[in-house]
């Protein structure tokens, strides 16, 4: 009996972890002119309201988490500065 209860609780915990996974939303723009690239953030801690710092073609921007994968979070270890990016 105890092993059945444990199995159910384990399954519930695993499904909760999977369902609570959050992602960056799919970017709206698929391309960007180099002169328009701007980083509003370089890591999640630069964002407010538990938003994610997401990499997009026109720079890094804070977005509310999405339940569906499609975007890409900024690597917090990557070299990054906020503001306009000049090439």
From Swiss-Prot:
Disulfide bonds join 24-54, 32-58, 41-53, 42-80, 47-62. Expressed by the venom gland. InterPro entries: Elafin-like_sf (IPR036645). GO terms for cellular component: extracellular region. Residues 1-20 form the signal peptide. Its main location: secreted. Keywords: Antibiotic, Antimicrobial, Disulfide bond, Secreted, Signal, Toxin. Contains 5 disulfide bonds. One of its GO terms (biological process) is defense response to bacterium. Belongs to the venom protein 11 family. 01 (wap-1) subfamily. This is U14-lycotoxin-Ls1b. It comes from Lycosa singoriensis (Wolf spider). It is found in: Secreted. Has antibacterial activity. Transmembrane segments: none annotated. It comes from the Eukaryota. One of its GO terms (molecular function) is toxin activity. Coiled coil: none annotated.
